[in-house]
Amino acid sequence: MLTTLIYRSRLCDTVPFRDVETMVAAANVRNEHESITGILLFNGLHFFQLLEGPENTVKTIYQQICKDVRHYNVVELMCDYAPARRFGKAGMELFDLRKHGQDDVLQAVLDKGTSRYQLTYSDRALQFVRTFVLTDGKDGVYEIPPADSWDFIADAQDDNAAPSDAAEEICFQPLID
């Protein structure tokens, strides 16, 4: 089944832009072989990508993306089935937002659309694209440092704490507004 997956992430500070360009070129070759299409937006700090293709292939590629050390804070924004491809001709089209105005990027994304029903702003996936472009990808984003920079320090022992042999369950769940 044709699947659309959208995610965003943050580029590691140590990765130069030429590595991004090399990655895009390699992904285009792989995506063509795997029947994956989509777009990649980059604002100099954040990636926003829409992938579309066979469900298992999209999910496998996304799992590889999540493990890629060139970026972090990977957040899946949408995963849904689609009746047709939105970007059937683009293996992975890169839009560098630093080089184009907001309206120009939005129009270029619309121009790359191949759906028999032209992409419109009412399209759910395009609403994500539009929001990323218009907010410069930074508004409303709480940046979490990379996992390898975290330090967890225990607070002083609480007298009301459960005994050390008591079973504990802790669950961290990300919240997205």
Name what the model sees in each region:
Residues 1-177:
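Charge-rich, low-complexity N-terminal segments
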